[in-house]
Amino acid sequence: MEASITVLLFAFTKVASSLYYEGSGHSDGEIQTNEVYVESRPLGPYRAPRWCYDLHISDGEATCYSPLGPRYRSTLGTRCRLSCDQGFKLIGQSSVQCLSSRRWSGNGHCRRIQCHVLPPIFYGSYHCSVGVSEGSRCDYSCAPGYMVEGDRSRICMEDGQWSGGEPVCVDLDPPKIQCPVSRMKVAEPEKLTARIFWGNPQVKDSADGVITRVFLRGPEPGSELPEGEHVIRYTAYDRAHNRASCKFIVKVQVRRCPDLTPPLHGYLTCSAAGNNYGATCEYHCEGGYERQGPAARVCQFSQNWAGTPSTCTPMLINVNVNSAGAFIDQFFEKQRLLFISSPSSSDRYYRMQTTALQSSGCGLEQRHVLIVELIGESPREVGRVRNQQLSKELIEELRQVLRISRSYFNMVLIDKHGVDRDRYRQPTASEDIFLFIDTYLLSPRELSQVESNKENCD
């Protein structure tokens, strides 16, 4: 009996050994090193049989359930669920069963989850925590002058895809611009303006260094600028249309002297603005007055007038001259002369004329008209101007030079340049004489004075 049992066991062992063939998942003493492998071990006792070899999965876990209980992991009918560690993905079947053929119904292995390599980003870069593995976080940064637009970080997900979208580096930083310093310049002599120059602004783009346009708002360098403050603005644009502006002030200063006071019985004529640096003011006296002092004064850079003020004093008439020309020349640009000649002081025309002029003294003075009388015939002729008497020789020469008749009444009007302007052979109303003077002889300034003082004369 015992011999029979021994023979049967030996025969069963031979049969069992013949079932181990290549590809069956069984081998003598073999340990597989692939990601899912079967550990070779000899068959245990019958009461703890291992029909299939134990499952091992690299970077994962096999959870098995046997009909005989938790102690049995590879008995016939055992089911195992395969899973992978974090960051790995199962390739193959997720559940296998130990079959009667001593094989597992399938196999699987764990592959590391990886995302594709992110493309480079223009004007920037990215840094990833663990490369392209699952869970890796890639943070984007941009070159100086650029900013990230879009997702600043992307994470490699479990499905092997990156979260979010691909960002870009955009130039949002405006260029740097620095204007020239503000400046002030004194207006040029006799001018209310100054020509001012300045350099170009300093412009730099913090991104790619390219400045496309620079605009100027205001006058150009080298412009002739009037008195006051002028704001100069520059605006620069980079290639991304970002802009930056700066401004500075250009000031033109006009140095001025105190206003001059016109002399009594006189007036001033000034160049430029009248009291600015370099302006010249000339003194003038009204008819019948002479200037005492300098003819002009100049406003200096120190804002003071050169010289001393002038005055206007009554004109001194010199009747002790040797010729008619010398007599008339002393009134040059000072007085107009109205010569009245009559054969006698009792002449009717003479008396009518003098009566009319006596009531028009204000009008004559306003128009700078001085009356010179030549009365009578030689040797009893009389000549006078104001309260001064003329010599007989001067009377005779004046009549000859001016071609004035001794035998009848006549008048001659001489302008301030000694030119014969009009003649009268009959008594003439003062208004008619004044109308001729106002129309043809008065300067615009003199006419304005006559109009402004008209009420005083009336």
UniProtKB/Swiss-Prot annotation:
Q: Which residues form the signal peptide?
A: 1-18
| Top-level taxonomy | Eukaryota, Metazoa, Chordata, Craniata, Vertebrata
- Keyword entries, A-Z: Angiogenesis, Cell adhesion, Cytoplasm, Disulfide bond, Repeat, Secreted, Signal, Sushi, Synapse
Please give the Pfam families that the UniProt record associates with this protein: DUF4174 (PF13778), HYR (PF02494), Sushi (PF00084)
- InterPro entries reported for this sequence: DUF4174, HYR_dom, SRPX-like, Sushi/SCR/CCP_sf, Sushi_SCR_CCP_dom
Q: Which domain of life is it from?
A: Eukaryota
What's the protein here called?
Answer: Sushi repeat-containing protein SRPX2
Q: Which GO terms describe its biological process?
A: angiogenesis; cell-cell adhesion; positive regulation of cell migration involved in sprouting angiogenesis; positive regulation of synapse assembly
